[in-house]
Amino acid sequence: MVEPRATYRVQLHPGFTFDDAANLAEYFAELGISHLYCSPYLQATPGSTHGYDVVDHRRINEDLGGAAGHARMHSALREYGLGQVLDLVPNHMAIVSPYNPWWWDVLENGPASNYASYFDVDWETPEKRLRNSVLIPVLGDQYGVVLESGEIVLERDGAVLTVRYHEHRFPVAPRSLDTILSAAALRCGSDELAFLADTFGRLPLPTATDLESTRRRHRDKDVLRTFLTRLLREHREVGPALDAVISEINQRRDALHLLLERQNYRLAYWRAASHDLGYRRFFDINTLVGMRMEDEYVFADTHFLVLRWLADGTLDGVRVDHIDGLRDPEQYLRRLHQAQPEAWIVVEKILEPGEALRASWPIAGTTGYDFLNTVNGLLIDPAAERPLTRFYTEFTGEPADFTRVALEKKDLVMREILGSDLNRLTALFLEVCERHPRHRDYTRHELHEAICAAVAHLPVYRTYLREAAAAGEAEESARGPEHVNPDDQRLIDAAIEGAKAARSDIDQRLFDFLRDLLLLRLHGTFEVELAMRFQQLTGPVMAKAVEDTAFYCFNRFVALNEVGGDPARFGVGAVEFHRECETAQAHWPLRMLTTSTHDTKRSDDLRARLCLLSEIPDRWIAAVRGWSEMNRPWWRGGLSDHNAEYLFYQTLVGAWPLERERILDYMRKAAREAKLHTSWTAPNEEYERSLAGFVEGALDNAEFIADLKTFVAPLVWPGRVNALAQTLIKLTAPGVPDFYQGGELWNVTLVDPDNRRPVDYALRRRLLSEMRCATVEQVLARADEGLPKLWLIRQALDLRRRQPQLFGRDGDYNPLRARGTHAAHAIAFSRGGDAISIAPRLPLTLGGDWADTTMALPSGRWRNEMTGDIVDGGEIALAKLLARFPVALLSREERAS
C-alpha cells in the first residue's frame, strides 16, 4: 500500500470513462498528484451520471468501459507511478428493475428470496396490507386510476413473465403463474402445461422462510421454468395460447388486479412513499434502498471486488460514502481494516462544531468537510456578524436565528419527507411500550411526537451506540452493551432535555423512557432495535433538513452555508485554526483535506470571493439597497421574495461573470430546496415564473449590471488572494490534499449539477506545459487564466514529493505568529521543522500594505518555492516575503552551522 500524497477526484460517467481518465495519467503525474480518486465505478444503473446508484457489486460499470477499460486505466496509472482511491457506497443500492439482480430476486420471491435479508426491508410491518410485501411507489396517480388507464401491463419474453409500467419492469411471482398457465393449458389442450400450472401453484409460499422450504422453492421454480422453456420450444401451440391469456388479463382490469395482488410487491402512487414505505432509503430517494451491511455475508458479497483490489494493489485506499447510514459504522470500518490493515480509509462524516471523530475507528480521518469549514472561517471577519445580521432581518423580514430555522426544518422533513421512516420507528416504539406496562397507555400520536422532538434536538448527525461487539472484538465484548461512550451520553441527554423543553405538553416520563431506550439501558430485542434505528434516522433528517433545506432558507451570509458548516458560526480565529491543526497532526495526520467536492454548495474560489463581503459590510449593504431599488419593477403579479433576492445578489457577486442559464437554474433549484414557496414534489409554477421573471429582468437591467460590475471589479484579485491562501493551507496543513476535478484553475461553480460540468483538460495540459519555463511574474500576468493557482499547486506538490517526511504522519506542526501592525492578517505554520507556509487573510482590510509586520524565521537558508528567492533566517518583513507572490512556501535549504 502506498500512502497518498495528494488525490485528484474525477467524476466518472458515460461521457468521461476509464479511458478518458487513463489518457490524463501523465498530466496528473506532472501536476504532482499521487492518487487518482474515482467516483464509484461498480455497475450502476445504465446511464448513471454519478455512480452512487450501484446495482451489481460483482461487476465493473460497463458504461465506463467495463473490466477491460478498468484494466487499461490501472495500467496507465501505474505507468506514471500513480495509485488509486475508490469511492465506496456501502449504505444503499439502486433498485431500478431489472438491473439489480438481487432486488429482482426479492421482488420475485418475497421474504423467501436468497437476498431478502440483504436489504433493510420491514417484512413484518404492523399494517396487514403491507405485510410480507414491498411497497413500490412509482405510479403517477392512484393505483386504481393507473390500472384502469391500461398503463400497467403483463408481458412475456419466452418463459419469463413480467409486469411493466412505462419504463419500470417487475417480475411475476412463480406461484402466481398457476392461473395463467392453467388457462393457457385449457386453451391449447396441453396436459404438460396443466401439470406445470399445478406444480407452480404448489411451490412453497414466499412466507415459508425455513431453510428446507426456500431451497425447495428455488430449486423447483428454476426446474419448472426450464420445462416451460422447453415446452414453448417444442410445442408451437403453447406460446400463442399463453399470449392470448395474457392479452385477456390486460383487457380485464379485475383479472390484472387479482394477479398483482398475488405479487410480493405493491405498486403505489409515488406520493405514498412519504408515509407508507416499508424499507430504509438513502434520504428520500425511493430507488435507493438501505443495505444490511451489519451482516457479515452482506459485507462479503458487496465487497468482493473491492477487497481483491485492495489486496492486489489496484487500490491503495477507499472513501466510504454516507458512513452515518450504516447500523454499526465501527463494525463496518473494522471489517474493512482487518481485510487490509494498510489501506488508507477516509469516511464521509460531517462533524458539527465541537464534535470529535471517534478515536476507535480504524481510519485515516474524514473526507475533509471539517477542514473546509475551518479554513473558510479563517477568511471571514467576525466583526461583520452584527451589521450583516441586522440588515438581513431588515431586508428580508426573516429571523436571524439559524438554530430556530434548523429545528423548524427538521420537523418539516420528518413529517413530510421522511415520514415513512418516522412512522416505522413510531410503530416499533409502540411495540416496545406494549412490553412495558408502565408505558403501554401512551398513544401512537404521543410516541410519534416524542420521537420527532428528540430527533430534532439531537445537535449532531448521529450517535454511535453499538448493540453488540463485532465478532473477534474481545475487549468490546467484555464491556458489553451497557458501555456507553460519554459523548453519546451527553448528546442523547441534550436531545431529550431539548425535547422536554420544547414539548412540555407531552408526559415528561415518556422522554425519560425514551432516553433509557436510546442509551441501551433496556436490553430486549425490540428495545435495542429502536435505539439502532433511531441512530440511522437522525443523520438523514439532519442532512435533508439542514444542508438541503435550511441552508437555502437562511441567507444571512451564504459563504457559511456549506456542507459540514454552521451558518451561526461567524468566522474562525487563528488560535482556533492552529488548535484544530495540532489535534489533526496528533490524531489524524493522514486525513483528507478538501475545499471543493462534488457535493459542496459552492466551490472554494466562489466562497473565497464571497468571504470578502465580511470585510466591507457597509459597502455591501449600500449596494444591495441600491440594487433592490433598481430591480423593484421586476417583481410582478404582486409576488416578491426578498430572501431569494438577497441570495441572488450574493450568488452574482461570488460567481460573476455568470451565464444566464446557470443562474436561472440555480435560483430555481434553491427555491425548491428551500421548500418555502415551491418544492420538488409540489412545484408552484406561479411563484417560479415570478422568480424567473425577476432574475431575467435584473439581468436585462443595464443600470444594475453596470453597478454590479463596478462593485465586483475590486473584489476579483482579493478574492483570488483568498483562494490562493486556502489552497496553500490545504496543500501543507496536516493531512492529504484533495483536488476536485478542474479545481487546479480558478473554480467558480455552484451546487450540482453546475459543479459537474465537463472539464477542459486540453487547456489545463497546455497551461501546465507553458508554465515549465515561466517566471512568477509571467504567471501572475496571466492570472485571469488561473495560472497562479496552477503554479501554487505544482510547486507545493513538488515539495511534498521531494520531502514527504515533512508533511506525513511524522511531520510535526507548529504555529508561527507574525509581529507588527498587521500581524492578525497573517496565518503561518511550519511543517516538519523545514517547511513554512505563510498566507494572508482578510486582504481587503489589509489593503496590500504589510507596514512593519514581520515574521521570525528559524535559522538557516530558506528557499521560497513560489518565487525561487533565498532568504536567511531571522526577522523578515512580510512585505518582502510576499512581494512577488501572494503566498509563500519556504523550504529550508540548509541549517545554520
Where are these regions (language model features)?
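Carbohydrate-interacting/catalytic domains
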Residues: 1-46, 58, 63, 71, ...
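Conserved short loop/turn motifs at secondary-structure junctions
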Residues: 91, 320-326, 781
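Active-site microenvironment for binding and transforming phosphate-containing groups
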Residues: 459
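Aromatic- and acidic-residue-enriched segments that line the glycan-binding/catalytic groove
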Residues: 48-56, 92-122, 360-369, 756
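Conserved, well-structured beta-alpha core segment at the onset of a catalytic domain
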Residues: 67-85, 93, 97, 104
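Active-site region of glycoside hydrolase catalytic domains
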Residues: 96-172
